[in-house]
Amino acid sequence: MPNDLESFINELLPTFPNLEGISDKVREAYLIIATAKFRFFLDPRRTGRIFIKDILTSPILAELYDLRSEKSPEEFLSNWFSKQNASKLVELFDQLDEDKNGFLSIDELSKFQWGLTRFFLSRVLDRYTKEENNYEMDFKTFVEFVLIIENRKTRQSILFFFECIDVFGKGYIDAFTINMFFKEVMQKLLTKDSEADKNFHIEDVKDEIFDMANPSDSKVISLYDLYKCGQGDTVLSIIVDAKAFFDYDQRELGNTLNVDEDSHFQIIPGLNDDEEMEEEDNNANNDILGMSKPAVKTYGKFAEV
C-alpha cells in the first residue's frame, strides 16, 4: 500500500507535461526516486514522518511543481524530479548491475565512482543492506546513496559517512581509523601517479584532518566535532575518496584528478548549499525523535513517508 507521500506525488503525475512519454520501466521507479529526495532533506532522522508544513514550504516541492512548466528537455536536466533525471538514474543502476539480479554487489558498486574506496563501500553495504539480499544494494537504497554522495555537506550525509568510518562503533574517529581507510586512498592514487606515495604522507594528512576538525579531545574526532567545525564533509571525504583527497590537496594550484573514464556516474542535481542548510535549519526546529512510525495515513501535522 502506498504511503502518504507516494500517494500525493502519484496524484500529481498526470499534471506534469515533462513526464509524458515516460517508459514503463522508469515509471515503476519514479516514485522511489521522487520520494527519496523529500525523505532525505525533510526526514533526516529517518523517523518515517515529515511535517506537512515543511513539505508545503520546501523548495523541493517547488522543484517538483516546476515540472508543470513548459521547458525544453535540456532545461529540465537540473531538476531531480524530471523524466531526464529519473531515466538517468535507472540507466545508471542497470549499467552497474552487470549480472542483472536487481542488486549491486561490492564489485558492481565499486564502478559507481572511481574515487570511493572499496573498504568504504564494503562498510556501506554492511551497514545499509540486508543479509537476505546477500548484503547487496537494491535500487531504492542506491537512490538514497546517490543523494548522500552528492549532498555531503548535509548533517545526514556527515552522519552516514561517520557511521561507516567508525568501524569499531566507538563514537569517534582516531588516527588508527584514519590510517586504516587512507591507505586504500593512497593505493588508488598510485594507479594514477606512480610517485603518489612520495608526494602524500599519511602523518601530514592526519595532522591536516585534526586541524580541520579541531576536536575537543585532541586524540579523537567525534560526530559533534564534525558538525561544529563546518568542514565535516571535507574531513570525511578525504579519508574515503581518492579524488576528493587529491582535489582538496591541490586546491590552491587548481589541479583536479580527471577520472571520468573510470566512473559511470555524472553529477545528479541536488539542492544548492544555501537551500540544503535552510532545510536543515527547518528540521532542527522540528525534532520528532522518539515518535513511533504511524500507520498509512496522515496524522494532522505529519505525513508518513
PLM regions: where:
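A positional/structural detector of protein chain ends, strongest at the extreme C-terminus
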Residues: 302-305
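Amphipathic regulatory helices of Ca2+-sensor modules
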Residues: 1-25, 50-65, 103-120, 136-150, ...
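Serine endopeptidase catalytic core focused on the charge-relay Asp
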Residues: 154
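C-terminal interaction modules of eukaryotic adaptor/scaffold proteins
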Residues: 199-298
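Primarily EF-hand calcium-binding motifs
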Residues: 1, 24-49, 85-101, 120-147, ...
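Eukaryote-specific, cytoplasm-facing alpha-helical/coiled-coil scaffolding segments in long proteins
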Residues: 32-34, 38, 61-68, 115-119, ...
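Core solenoid repeat modules with strong leucine/isoleucine-rich periodicity
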Residues: 48-55, 63-69, 76-79, 83-109
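Conserved, structured regulatory domains from eukaryotic proteins
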Residues: 6-45, 56-66, 71-82, 158, ...
